[in-house]
Amino acid sequence: MASYLRLRILFAMPSSKAVVRYKNEINRASHSLDIAEARIILSAIAQVPRNSEVSDRELYWVSAADVVSLGSGSTSVYQQMKTAAENLFNRYITLQNESSSGRTGKSVLKFRWIQAVQYEEGTGKIGIQFSARILPFISHIQSEFTHYHLCELEGFQNYNTVRLYSMIAQYKSTGKFFTTVAHLRVALELGDKYPAYAELKRR
């Protein structure tokens, strides 16, 4: 029998106008990011125009100040951004759907978040060029999308916390979040961690 998780949702009033917006499929995917990389990716997504087509040649700049404003330590932010610049090119997103071929099982699609990254030594600025595969999920969005103000992520120190908050934000209009524990395990890439449902709830 599947285990389910229900949460009642309360959101604080935002203090910034920068909005993260993407298709709901992103919430159901696994992401392979750490918290520093996530702050950079989400800061870049917040710059993508909502209602217009975007080329994969666009470069979105994220500064050290942007990352610090989301909760990164100011003394280590330059090293965090340099490390993130080295790692982001190899980070990917994995989408699982029912097989479209009529066969039983899942259809798994894996692609990179970005196709290029540029790091400016001494300035702590990173330029992000999103991959062509991710663009349909983060640009020209008209329906079935999740959105929240970037500043709502301030102080989160663990990427799974960001992920869970993002999943909940999808249902902010209803005030209730409902999912299976099995889905959380896949989306948060928990594997065999916290095998007991009660332990997962505590975490």
What spans do the regions from the language model cover?
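Charged, alpha-helix-forming regions
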Residues: 2-203
